[in-house]
Amino acid sequence: LFMIPKKIHYCWFGRGPLPDLAKKCIASWRKYLPEYEIKEWNEDNFDLDAYPYVREAYDSRKFAFVTDVVRLYALYNEGGIYMDTDVEVLKPLDSILHYQAVSGFESQTRIQTGLMACREGHPLFKELLEEYDNLHFIRSNGSLDLTTNVTRITNTCLKYGFVPNNKLQTVNGFTLLPCDYLCPKDLETKELHVTENTLCIHHFDGSWLPKSVKRKRKLQRLLGKRITSWCVWLKRLCSI
């Protein structure tokens, strides 16, 4: 008996058209998950004023941070699988439905949030969602709180014994799979490491990233890890 319902949640806020990558990825969901219900969350079916954080992020047009809350709300209240619109499915996902809750590693040390799944009412997702009850996206000094949900969820799981080692583990009923299952693409280099375990690819479109960060990451990919590390070392040496 499956514990996680065959229901896919995704978010699209801002009223803009879906980019080609999103259309391609959603088409892959329909191809490999034909019996799954697919639900889009947007301004019409989510109350933006339910959380001050959401309203402030929305009005700042930082829609990715809106989805940080909405994905947790959808999963906690309805159960199912949440996917970012830049997640391409490569094969059926039935193999993860027996877990109480499941995600995976984004890197050797961090939990990815591009694909998350749980049964309705999972207590850890309740805690993760409630963290936003008293949060504001716009700080008292007017700056924006750009803390990612990857950081928030990783930090919460650390309280429950999460070991940042890219190895299969279950933390407070939340099973975490190694990178190659759900997130085989390196966030920094964009290199793909697909294995027989790989179920999907998170393409890391990164629409929420500031342009300066996008430029920095593009430069890092062009230079490669070794040269980038050498440049960082040289910069630190020169600043001494």
Regions inferred by a protein language model and the residue ranges of each:
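Glycosyltransferase-associated regions of secretory-pathway enzymes
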Residues: 1-67, 83-240
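Small-residue hinge/turn detector
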Residues: 69-80
